[in-house]
Amino acid sequence: MAYDDLRSFLDTLEKEGQLLRITDEVLPEPDLAAAANATGRIGENAPALHFDNVKGFTDARIAMNVHGSWANHALALGLPKNTPVKEQVEEFARRWDAFPVAPERREEAPWRENTQEGEDVDLFSVLPLFRLNDGDGGFYLDKAAVVSRDPEDRDDFGKQNVGTYRIQVIGTNRLAFHPAMHDVAQHLRKAEEKGEDLPIAITLGNDPVMAIVAGMPMAYDQSEYEMAGALRGAPAPIATAPLTGFDVPWGSEVVIEGVIESRKRRIEGPFGEFTGHYSGGRRMPVIRVERVSYRHEPVFESLYLGMPWNECDYLVGPNTCVPLLKQLRAEFPEVQAVNAMYTHGLMVIISTAKRYGGFAKAVGMRAMTTPHGLGYVAQVILVDEDVDPFNLPQVMWAMSAKVNPKDDVVVIPNLSVLELAPAAQPAGISSKMIIDATTPVAPDVRGNFSTPAKDLPETAEWAARLQRLIAARV
C-alpha cells in the first residue's frame, strides 16, 4: 500500500496495533523525548506515539517514533508487519531496480489550507516546539524533508535535492541550518560564490516513504521523488510550492519557504545527534522564513536522536545498506550483501566472494570512496560470501577465527568524515580502518585454513521442517 501522507500511515499503524495514543497530560520536556527514547528500550516492535494533551500547548498533535520499529518500517513499505529485517532489506533492493518512477503532480495540496507570509510569519504559533535532549541548544526540526536546487542548473529535476538536515529554530522567522557535507551544501556553496541567497523549502510531517528517501545516500543527480516512486510501487505525489516554485511532497503537514541568507552565520547547537553524542555549537547558515503553509490542525512529527537503538536507526538502516550494495555491485559483482545498519553506516559489514588475494581489502577501500562512504564509512569489516553480515554471531566468528591483525587490519590516515563524527580529529578528518575477516585465497596463502566445516546439505531442509513442527505444536 502506498501512503500519500502521514495521517493515512498513522491510521494504518493504529489498525495494526502499532500506534499508541497517549491522552493523559504530559509535559513537553522531558516527557515527549523521554517517551520516544523509551521505545528503543522495550524491543524491536515498539509502537509509534501520538500525543494530543501536552501541557502549555493549545490543541497540539505530536507524532514520534513513527518509523521506530521493524514492524513500522515494514508497514511503511507496504509489507506485513512481521517481515524479518533482512527480508525488508532484500525487498528494498528489489524495488530500487524499478528506479526511476516519475512523480505525479497534483493540485489542491492539503498544506495550502492555512498560510502565514512576510511579517506575519510566526513559527511558534504553528509548531509545538520542545527540546529532544536536555543539553540541546534550542528547539529543532529534525525530521524535515528539505528541498533545494542547484543554482547552476535550476531546471534539472534530478539535481533538486530532498534531504533531512537538522534545523534549529532561533526566532519567529529565523532558522539556523546544518547542511553537513551533502547535496544542499554544494547548492549553498554555489549560491554563495555568486553572492546569492539560496531558496529553500522545508517540509514537515511527510508520508513514510518520503521520510525514508530523504535520508538515503543517493547520487547527486538522482531524484529522491523518483526513488520514492520506486519504493512505493506508485508515483510519488508532489505539488508546487507557491513561493519558491519547488517540487514538494503533496501530503506534507507543513511547508516552510524562504532563503538561506548568503554568507550569514549564527551559532547553531549543541544538539544530541545520531552518533549518541552531542555535537557542539558552530557557526552555521541562517534561513529567513518568508512563508509558512500548513494543514488544519497539523500533526507535528519529531525524531528522537541519541544512543541506539532509536527511531533514527530504523529509519536510516535499510536506506543506507541498499545504496552501498548497489554502488559496490556496479564495480564488484562479487559483493553479496551489505550491513550498514550501525550509526548511518559509520561502520559497515560486507560479505563478498574474492577473485584473488587482497580482493576483499579493495572492496573495503571502495566502500570508503562511494558517495556515502566519503563522509561516513569509517570502519569496514569484510567477510566471506557464505557469512551473513546481518548475523552478528557469524561475523564475530569470522573475525575471531580468520583475522591476523598484522596482515588483516589496515588503517588509512587522514580521510574525510562528517563533522558530526565524535572520533574525528580535527572535525571532518579521521583515520579509517578495514578488517579483512575473509579466508585468504591465492596468491595470499597465509594461515592454516583447512577445508571449512560447512552446513550439511540437509540442514536447510531440516530447519524448515523443525519450524513447521514447532508451529504445529503451538
UniProtKB/Swiss-Prot annotation:
| Name this polypeptide is given | Phenolic acid decarboxylase
Signal peptide limits: none
Spell out the GO cellular component terms annotated for this protein, sorted alphabetically and separated by semicolons.
cytosol
Q: Which terms are listed as keywords in the entry?
A: Aromatic hydrocarbons catabolism, Decarboxylase, Detoxification, Flavoprotein, FMN, Lyase, Manganese, Metal-binding
Provide the residue positions that the database annotates as binding Mn(2+).
161, 182, 224
Q: EC class of this enzyme?
A: lyase
One example GO MF annotation:
3-octaprenyl-4-hydroxybenzoate carboxy-lyase activity
Family that this chain belongs to? Belongs to the UbiD family. YclC subfamily.
The protein's matches in Pfam families, at most eight in alphabetical order, are given as: UbiD, UbiD_C, UbiD_N
Gene Ontology biological process terms in this record: catabolic process; response to toxic substance; ubiquinone biosynthetic process
Which conditions up-regulate this protein? By vanillate.
Give me the residues that bind prenylated FMN, please: 161-166, 181-182
Tell me which domain of life the UniProt entry assigns to the organism this sequence originates from. Answer: Bacteria
Q: What is its EC number?
A: 4.1.1.-
**Reaction catalysis annotation:** vanillate + H(+) = guaiacol + CO2
Give the cofactor note: Binds 1 prenylated FMN per subunit.
Q: Where is the active site?
A: 273 (proton donor)
Species name: Streptomyces sp. (strain D7)
InterPro entries assigned: BsdC, PAD_UbiD-like, UbiD, UbiD-like_C, UbiD-like_N, UbiD_Rift_dom
